[in-house]
């Protein structure tokens, strides 16, 4: 058990943060507020076009988990329109262009270059985040990402979701834990930051299963992790096959489990998300999950009440 509170516990603005949030990390790294802007780069997915599978992952809507992403096809203009909306609130902020929808390395390198370089041409963009599948990182793409990483702040977000083969098959992921391990190793060997996405509460998984997935990712020594509850959304295959499934019946049930996960995550791993925020019009369950601010406040309050923090059990 780690009884020494980590460095992020006390912050200069008087907050007592108990997790190493990416927003806190970025503010310390750049010395100012950094905002992540979701972008739809016009990519597709090998799990939709037949090269890996069809129908997509069972939990994905037709937007490929990018319901919040802006996507007119003009990357620079999409960024500019989002920045204009929030510039008044944070006039000194910098921005990270987050390519979120579908699989953002599933294309020839020249297509990737066109999209990513367009984002980096914006004078207020200080970095880039790229979400992808672990089985879509061929050598030429990795070489380009390494070159990109050498001249901007960057991370690659790998969707793992779970390490358990039975769930991977049920969710129609069409990739394996071994694919993830190899992708993470190949990225990190090139000096590229890796952020791993996990879903808590997938159908059929126990608390022990979920903690095993978290522990596995921690053993990879990644830069960051994303955790959130399984959200059943309209337009996903599971909305048809598991229409009555609820991952966590109550907010308190999720809070208890996610805190257990946070306690075993080393404090040097940045947490990019600890909740899900599916748009309310497409959210089926759990109904309480749209109350993101209430949930986050409750997680932090509960951690304070329990006098616990990220990495306490490492």
Where are these regions (language model features)?
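Auxiliary Fe-S-binding modules of radical SAM enzymes
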Residues: 2-24, 33-35, 224, 232-314
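Distinct, well-ordered alpha-helical segments
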Residues: 109-117, 138-149, 170, 210
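Alpha-helix N-cap and loop-to-helix initiation/capping positions
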Residues: 74, 107, 111, 171-179, ...
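Acidic (Asp/Glu)-rich catalytic clusters
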Residues: 86-90, 116-123, 143-153, 185-189
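Core AdoMet radical
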Residues: 63-82, 86-109, 124-137, 153-180, ...
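N-terminal [4Fe-4S]-dependent radical SAM core
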Residues: 1-96
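Conserved C-terminal portion of the radical SAM core fold
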Residues: 178-237, 252-275
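Hydrophobic faces of well-ordered beta-strands that scaffold small-molecule active sites
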Residues: 35-39, 95-97, 128-130, 154-158, ...
């Amino acid at each position: 058990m780690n009884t020494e509170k980590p460095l992020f516990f006390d912050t200069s603005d008087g907050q007592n943060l108990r997790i190493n949030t990416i927003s806190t990390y970025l503010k310390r790294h750049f010395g100012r507020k950094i905002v992540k802007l979701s972008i739809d780069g016009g990519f597709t997915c090998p799990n939709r076009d037949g090269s890996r599978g069809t129908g997509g992952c069972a939990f994905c809507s037709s937007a490929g988990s990018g319901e919040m992403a802006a996507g007119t096809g003009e990357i620079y203009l999409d960024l500019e329109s989002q920045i204009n909306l929030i510039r008044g609130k944070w006039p000194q902020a910098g921005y990270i262009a987050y390519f979120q929808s579908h699989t953002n390395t599933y294309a020839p390198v020249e297509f990737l270059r066109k999209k990513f370089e367009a984002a980096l041409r914006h004078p207020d963009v200080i970095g880039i985040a790229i979400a992808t599948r672990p089985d879509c990182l061929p050598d030429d793409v990795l070489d380009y990402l390494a070159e990109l990483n050498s001249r901007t702040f960057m991370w690659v977000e790998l969707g793992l979701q779970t390490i358990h083969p039975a769930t991977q098959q049920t969710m129609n992921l069409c990739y394996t834990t071994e694919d993830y391990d190899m992708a993470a190793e190949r990225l990190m060997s090139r000096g590229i930051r890796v952020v791993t996405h996990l879903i808590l509460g997938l159908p059929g998984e126990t608390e022990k299963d979920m903690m095993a997935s978290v522990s596995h990712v921690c053993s990879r020594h990644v830069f960051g992790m994303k955790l959130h509850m399984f959200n059943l959304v309209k337009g996903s295959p599971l909305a048809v096959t598991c229409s009555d499934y609820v991952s966590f019946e109550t907010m308190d049930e999720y809070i208890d489990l996610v805190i257990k996960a946070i306690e075993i995550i080393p404090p040097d791993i940045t947490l990019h998300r600890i909740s899900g925020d599916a748009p309310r019009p497409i959210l089926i369950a759990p109904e309480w999950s749209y109350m993101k601010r209430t949930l986050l406040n409750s997680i932090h309050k509960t951690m304070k009440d329990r006098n616990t923090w990220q990495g306490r059990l490492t």
